[in-house]
Design a protein with these regions (language model features):
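Mid/C-terminal beta-alpha module of Rossmann-like enzyme folds, strongest
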Residues: 172, 193-195, 202-245
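Adenosine-cofactor binding site in Rossmann-like domains, unifying the SAM/SAH pocket
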Residues: 31-49
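NAD(P)H-binding glycine-rich loop region in Rossmannoid oxidoreductase-like domains
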Residues: 44-84
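N-terminal Rossmann NAD(P)H-binding glycine-rich loop of SDR-like oxidoreductase domains
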Residues: 4-25
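C-terminal amphipathic/interface module of NAD(P)-dependent oxidoreductases
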Residues: 233-238, 244-270
Length: 270
């Protein structure tokens, strides 16, 4: 097997740590960028920064994880969201074509026609979703590949991700309000990372696909099942309804292939 240099942008994020581990487990070399840490700690929106990073790290392929993902931040700064979520991935696609896998989100959909296949038309409700949808178009127009991801969970030392944040709140006896009317197809971050690495090293794959967990669940059901699996007190989970017009109600995805493990096994691995 040929060992590749895989550039991972946004490596300091929740998914980034899992991807680095998956890259190394597969026998490849991880070279990283992040806003706050990494081999190249950079703001990729800066003039010429994508080219500078590529020149410095000389990757064979790219996994582009970096994003502006907080919905409120994107609503406040839509131009910044477009720069981060659309223009930066476009520049990587111009350089790498099919040797780029750029991540997108289930929030490019409006939640009215789930479950969504990769061929379903996008209809984002938020500035975040709009910027990611634009990024998808720009990447694909330049021969790059796009992978849409659902809600991710799994262990994290900094308490990030759906399950780690819940565990921290319950252990601190803090109430977590969880939506009963918002549905996703949650996927363990380690499973997502392994699939992403397998995709990026095979540049002949499809230009657009979905990764997703094996079950459609509400945020509240996710919390209950996670708490039960780990013996945590579910009284700190408060069921509530989402009333935010910018949040789609059901963005469950049809995965490109079946999940490697069932949902309970994923929950146990947190």
């Amino acid at each position: 097997m040929v060992s590749l240099r895989i550039l991972i942008t946004g490596a300091s994020g929740f998914l980034g740590g899992h991807v680095i581990a998956a890259v190394r487990a597969a026998g490849h070399v991880a070279c990283t960028t992040a806003r706050r840490s990494g081999e190249a700690a950079v703001d990729l929106t800066g003039p010429g920064m994508v080219d500078a990073v590529v020149q410095a790290l000389r990757p064979d392929v790219v996994l582009h994880l970096a994003a502006m993902a907080r919905l409120a931040d994107c609503e406040r700064e839509p131009a910044r969201a477009t720069a981060v979520n659309a223009l930066v991935p476009q520049r990587f696609a111009e350089r790498f074509g099919a040797r780029l896998v750029s991540l997108s989100t289930d929030l490019v959909f409006d939640g009215r026609w789930a479950p969504y296949s990769a061929l379903a038309p996008v209809a984002p409700l938020s500035a975040y979703g709009q910027s990611k949808a634009e990024g998808e178009e720009r990447v694909r127009a330049n021969g790059g590949r796009v992978v849409r991801l659902p809600l991710l969970f799994g262990p994290d030392a900094e308490g990030r991700g759906a399950s780690a944040a819940l565990r921290t709140a319950i252990e601190r006896r803090q109430v977590s309000a969880l939506f009963t009317n918002e549905y996703r197809t949650p996927l363990h971050a380690a499973d997502a990372a392994a699939q992403l690495v397998a995709l990026v090293v095979e540049p002949e794959g499809p230009l657009l696909l979905h990764l997703a967990g094996p079950e459609r669940v509400s945020r509240y059901e996710f919390g209950l099942r996670f708490a039960r699996r780990h013996g945590l007190d579910a009284k700190w989970l408060q069921p509530t309804e989402c009333m935010d017009a910018l949040r789609p109600r059901d963005v469950s995805l049809v995965a490109a292939w079946p999940a490697a493990r069932d949902f309970e096994a994923m929950l146990a691995d947190c």
